[in-house]
A protein has these predicted regions:
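Structural scaffold elements adjacent to functional motifs in cytosolic proteins
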Residues: 60-62
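Short, surface-exposed ligand- or partner-binding patches at beta-edge/loop junctions that are enriched
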Residues: 114-115
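Rhodanese-like catalytic fold shared by cysteine-dependent sulfurtransferases
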Residues: 2-58, 67-111, 122-170
Length: 170
């Protein structure tokens, strides 16, 4: 028995890989960001971010320093591209390039969720990514440790750890 072959590529093989449709929670964040005139794709809470990461619908990138990740804790399986380094938080001039390179290594294009301590540095990082032409880069509001409470302490009010989401510490 013989099989017919063709030298023309199939439509699926010829077409570039399209990113999957944004999950509804990210579509909502994007619409809200556009309505507010934010210079990046928008923000999601840790409780919104975790299911997306868990289901393989988004890539979680921790933008804190290596020291913060080591001594304060980190989300298992999260990628790392430092927005800044050292105790002076010296800005990483290669941040957007490093984030783009990390994203390009993924087997399929995914939205990126940036996580820092409180959601402030990750918002700046998302803005920088947008300026560099990266789309669908979102901030995780509240961050890993959360906002300050009335006593100026973190971790008692909101944030990744406060909600009991997965994390590990060296």
């Amino acid at each position: 028995m013989t099989h017919a072959t063709t030298d023309t590529p199939t439509a699926a093989a010829a077409a570039p890989q399209q990113p999957p449709a944004l999950p509804a929670v990210l579509q909502q964040a994007l619409a809200q960001a556009q309505a507010q005139g934010l210079p990046y794709a928008g923000s999601v809470t840790p409780l919104q971010a975790w299911p997306l990461v868990q289901q393989g619908q988004a890539l979680l990138v921790d933008v804190r320093t290596a020291e913060e990740r080591k001594f304060v804790g980190q989300v298992p399986g999260s990628a790392h591209v430092a927005w800044a380094s050292g105790t002076a938080l010296t800005r990483n001039p290669r941040f957007a390039r490093e984030l783009a390179a990390l994203h390009a290594k993924q087997p399929q294009p995914l939205p990126v969720l940036l996580l820092c301590r409180s959601g402030k540095r990750s918002a700046l990082a998302a803005q920088e990514a947008a300026k560099a032409g990266l789309t669908h880069v979102f901030n995780v509001s509240e961050g890993f440790e959360g906002d300050h409470d009335a006593l100026q302490q973190r971790g008692h009010f909101n944030g990744w750890r406060f909600y009991g989401l997965p994390w590990v510490q060296d």
